[in-house]
Amino acid sequence: MRHLDVTAYQSAEKLLPHHRSALVPGGRVRPVWIDGGARFWYRSGTRFVLVDPAAGVRVPAFDHERLAAALATASGQNVDAAALPFAAIQMSGRTVEFAAFGGHWRCALDTYVLEGCEPRPTAAFVETASPDQRHAVFRRDHNLWVRRLADGKEWALTSDGRADHDYATAPDWWQNSVLVRKLGFATMPPAAAWSPDGTRVLTHRTDQRGVRRNHRIEALPADGGPPRLHTQRYAHPGDERVPLAELVVLDIATGAVVRASAEPLPMSVVSPVMTRWAWWAADGGAVYYLSRPREGRSLSLHRLDPGTGHVTTLLTESGATRVEPNQWAEGQAPMVRLLGGGNEVLWYSQRDGWGHLYLYEAGTGALLGQVTSGEWAVREILHVDETDRVVYFTAAGLIPDDPYRRTVCRIGLDGHDLARLTGDDVDHDVMVAPNGAYFVDSASTTATPAVTTVRGWDGRVLVELEHADITRLLATGWTPPERFRVKAADGVTDLYGVLYRPHHFDPAGRYPIVDTPYPGPQTNRVHPTFDPGILGHEAEAMAALGFVVVAVDGRGSPGRDKTFSDASYGNLGDACDQAAALRQLARTRPWMDLDRVGVVGISAGGHQAVRAMLDHPDLYKAGISSCGTHELRHLHAGHAELYHGMPGEADYDRVSNVARADRLAGKLLLIHGGMDPNVLPDHTMRLAERLITLDKDVEMLVIPGAEHLFLGYEHHLYRRRWDFLVRHLMDAEPPQHHITPLVFDADFLAAWF
C-alpha cells in the first residue's frame, strides 16, 4: 500500500476555515455601526478602517503608528502598529477606546494623548441590552431580571417563574449549554426584545411541563468529578406536549406584567423572539407576531396591544404543505413589514408557486395587490421607502445562468416599475445600515473574489471598501470551483452545484470522488458567493488531498420555486439527485472515477450520506456521517413535523436509516458527540446497534464531550475523516500528521453565530 505524502495534509490544513481570512484579505467586511448607522468601522486585516458613506469617505480609523507609540509609552509594553493588541474599539466623537494589557484605554485623536479609563458600562454576554444602553435583562432562578448598567442595581421583572415554566428561555437544545460553558459563559442571553424607547421588554414564559425528557452522560466534567447526568426537555414528532411560548410584555419602571390574551405558540425548535417572529412596532405602540400550528400548513399575523394584552389576528394564509415567511429558516427575519403606522402589511407568500410579496390592508385583511411576480423569488426585503411607496429587495432567478445569485431590485408597492439596482450577473450579499440610508454590498461568484462597496438606494457606489486578494489562496494550490448545471433524477429539473478539482490536477489522471451533501430544507449546501460558507470549507481542503469534491443543491432545498422546495416533503434526505448528478458529471469528465466514490455529511447531511450508501450501494463505496439524523422520529418535533409531515400522515420508516440498515455494502464511519443536544447521540447508537446486529462492519467514533458543532475537537475530526477517505478511496496509508487545534477567535465564531 502506498503512503500519501504529508504535504497533502499540510496543504489541506491551510485551507480550513480558521485560515480563510489570512488567505483572502479583504474577503469579508463586518461593519460595526456607530452614530445610529450613519458611519461604521471594520477591520481590514490588522488595520481599523472608518467609513462615512454620506461623505463618500473611507479612511484609517486612527493613526495606527501614533496610537501604538502612545500605548507603548503608557503601558510599558512593546506595541506593533501592524498587530495592535486589541480586536475591537469604541469610537465617540474624536476619541477611541479599547482594552489591552489587562486595562481599558482612551485615546484623544486630536493629540494622541492616551490615558487609562474605566470601561463604559456594557451588557454581559448573558444579558440583552436596551437600545439606549441604560439597562440589560438577564435570567435568574427561572425569572427575568433587569440591571441598570450605570450603577449595577438589579430588580426582578417576574417572580412566578418555576422549573419547566420559566421566563425568556428557548428550548433546551437551542440553549447550547455544553457549547456555552466551553466559551466561558453560564447560559445563553435571554429571549427578550426591548421596546424602541427602552422602557418595556417583550419576552415569553416558556411552558415545558410534561415535555419528554432525554438524557446524556458527561463522562469527564470540567471539574474532573465523576460522570454527570444531563437531562433535557426534547419533544419528538407526534408528542402530545411540546415547548410553548406564552408572550408577555414587562414594564421595567412600573413592574407591570401584560400577558397576551391568546393561545401560546408551539416552540419545539427556537424562541419566536430570537427568530424575530415576534417584534415591536417602530413606535413601540404594538407588538406583532407570527404563529402557525405544529404541522405548519397555515401562517397568521397578529397584533398584540402591549398595554392590555389584547390580540387581533390580521392575516392568515393556508397551504397544502408548510407556509413560510421565507424559505431560509437560519438567521433571516420573516419577510413581513407593517406599513403606514400598521395600516398595511407587506407579506411574503409562495401561493403562485414562487416566493413573492403581496400588499394587504391590515384592518380588514383585504388583499390590495401582488407587488412582485414572475418566475423568480424574492430573497430578502431590504428597505421600504414609505414616502415614495417603493420596496427594495434581493431577488434570485433574474440571472439566467444561475438562479441562486441575488440581484438588488426595487419596485413600487403598486407592483409597477421593477428595476435592478445591480445590473451585473454576479451575486450580491447585502447588509443594510441600521438607519436604512445605504447598504454594504459584497459582489462575487463562486469563482470571482468579492468586491465590497457601500451603495445608495439608486444603486450608485458611494464608497469602495475592499477588493479580495486571493494571491495567498492561489499559492496553496487552490483553483476556483467549477459551477455546474445537471438534471435531477427526474431528468427534467435543473440542479446547480460546484466541483473542486484536486490539487495538481492532471486531466489524463483518474481521481476518487467525494460527495458533500446537505439536504436542507432550511438552508442551502452551496452558496453562490466566493466564500463557500461554513458547510463548504472542508471541500476545499479535501480537494487538496487529491479528491474531486462535489456539492449540489438537490430538490427539496430552498431558493427556487415552491415545487422544488416541497420535493423533500415526506421524503427528507433522499439522495437520488446526488447520485444522478455524479453520474452525469462523470460522463463528460473521464478523470472522475465512479468506482471510487465517497460521501461525507454532517447533521442532516450525515443522514443523507448514510442514505446515499443504503439506496445507491453500487455508487457510494465509503461514507462518513457526523451527528447524522438517522431516525427522524427521534428528532425535535418542530423540524420533523414541519419539513417531513406529522406522524400518521408521513411515513417515518421511509426516511429511517435504521430501518434500511441491511442494505449497507460499503465502508462506513459514524461519528457523534456524546453531549450533542441537537441531534441526540441515540441516532448514531441506534444505527450502530442495528448494523452490529446484522453483522455489518462499521467504524464508530464517539467524542464524549463534544456537542453538535464539535468545537474544540475539529482538528481530530478533520484528521479522522481524511484518514478514512484516504484509506478507502485512495487505497493509501495516510501520513502521520496532526492538525493544530483551532482557536475560538472572533472571526471563527462569527462564521457559526
What is the predicted function of each stretch?
Residues M1-V432, A437-T448, V454-R455, E733-P735, ...:
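Beta-propeller folds
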Residues A262, W277, G284, L290, ...:
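Serine-hydrolase catalytic core recognition
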